[in-house]
């Protein structure tokens, strides 16, 4: 799949970048790859990754997706791009929405444009459930990032570069997520702070996130959006599961929802479900390839609009306490934290 190819990962020192590199190294995929380029802003994280991985095929590029020239330079002779660079903290983006716009929208446009100009074969854009029916700045910026990618796909149907989107639910134990917060609170003998006990979130592992991107890479066509079917849990059950795993007696304290938070998340809208293809573990949402010449569609007729329920963390499979414990105990992060407890 990647034999003698050059890959670029934007935001490559983040959770996804570390996870996909771990997969490539563990499965010995990297021996067939020509080069993997890690593009990010943080030189310290790059240095840490360089020392930890110590692999000559992994190259590091300091730059910011907000700066077109830096991403264009890194894109030279690249075959495939995984675009993971983003601002993803919901409350932070609420206070600094222009920063979300600059990174998640304008930065994404720079990546997509550079990929087109440099004739990259395929670009996988990493999005989020918060882009569906968005109510916060982060979700809105990611929704527009998706629109940029699909618009590029629509305009590049006959060109070389293929653009696909993947949407994540909550990636467990990723940087800035709630699981590391709860574990730190347990270890420091503090109250576990829960925003709203009945709030539900999809539960994906970092392994799942890599599987989703690689599936989209292998099977995605121009303008496809891919979503992995995922179970969900309430935040309270998640906290209690970690209490049980770490044998903790810490109290749970409810603090109320934060800026921009939703009670539940949607991975596929009802409008998208009407045209989605069920692929077993995944949904594929094909691009609407029509152009602006609507007159011909009135002549041809339109497909009947199907009314389907959106796919949400409220109507997906809901895990009970023991099931959440089992899921958490399979995470490398939780296993490491247990060893160090």
Swiss-Prot record:
One of its GO terms (biological process) is lipopolysaccharide biosynthetic process. This is UDP-glucose 4-epimerase. Keywords: Isomerase, Lipopolysaccharide biosynthesis. Its EC number is 5.1.3.2. Gene3D superfamilies: NAD(P)-binding Rossmann-like Domain. The keyword Isomerase applies. It comes from Rickettsia bellii (strain OSU 85-389). GO terms for molecular function: UDP-glucose 4-epimerase activity. It comes from the Bacteria. It is an enzyme of class 5 (isomerase). The keyword Isomerase applies. Signal peptide: none annotated. Belongs to the polysaccharide synthase family. The gene is capD. It catalyses: UDP-alpha-D-glucose = UDP-alpha-D-galactose. Epimerizes UDP-galactose to UDP-glucose.
């Amino acid at each position: 799949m990647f034999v003698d190819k050059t890959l670029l990962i934007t935001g490559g020192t983040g959770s996804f970048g570390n996870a996909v590199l771990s997969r490539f190294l563990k499965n010995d995929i990297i021996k067939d790859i020509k080069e993997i380029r890690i593009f990010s802003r943080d030189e310290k994280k790059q240095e840490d990754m360089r020392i930890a991985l110590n692999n000559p095929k992994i190259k590091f590029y300091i730059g910011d997706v907000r700066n077109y020239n830096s991403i264009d330079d890194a894109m030279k002779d690249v075959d495939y791009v995984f675009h993971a660079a983003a601002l993803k903290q919901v409350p932070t983006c609420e206070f600094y929405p222009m920063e979300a716009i600059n990174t998640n929208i304008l930065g994404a446009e720079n990546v997509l444009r550079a990929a087109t100009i440099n004739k990259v074969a395929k670009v996988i854009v990493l999005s989020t459930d918060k882009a569906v029916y968005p109510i916060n700045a982060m979700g809105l910026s990611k929704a527009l990032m998706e629109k940029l990618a699909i618009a590029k796909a629509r305009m590049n149907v006959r060109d070389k570069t293929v653009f696909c989107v993947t949407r994540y639910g909550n990636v467990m134990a990723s940087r800035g997520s709630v699981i590391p917060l709860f574990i730190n609170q347990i270890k420091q003998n503090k109250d576990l702070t829960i925003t709203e006990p009945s709030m539900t979130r999809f539960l994906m592992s970092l392994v799942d996130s890599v599987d989703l991107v690689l599936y989209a890479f292998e099977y995605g066509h121009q303008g496809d959006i891919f979503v992995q079917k995922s179970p969900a849990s309430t935040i309270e059950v998640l906290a209690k599961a970690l209490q049980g795993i770490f044998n903790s007696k810490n109290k749970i304290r409810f603090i109320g929802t934060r800026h921009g938070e939703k009670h539940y998340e949607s991975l596929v809208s009802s409008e998208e479900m009407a045209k989605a293809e069920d692929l077993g573990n995944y949904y594929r949402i094909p691009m609407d390839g029509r152009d602006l010449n609507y007159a011909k569609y009135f002549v041809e007729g339109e497909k009947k609009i199907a009314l389907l329920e959106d796919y949400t963390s409220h109507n997906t499979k809901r895990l009970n306490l023991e099931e959440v414990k089992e899921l958490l105990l399979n995470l490398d992060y939780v296993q490491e934290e247990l060893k160090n407890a």
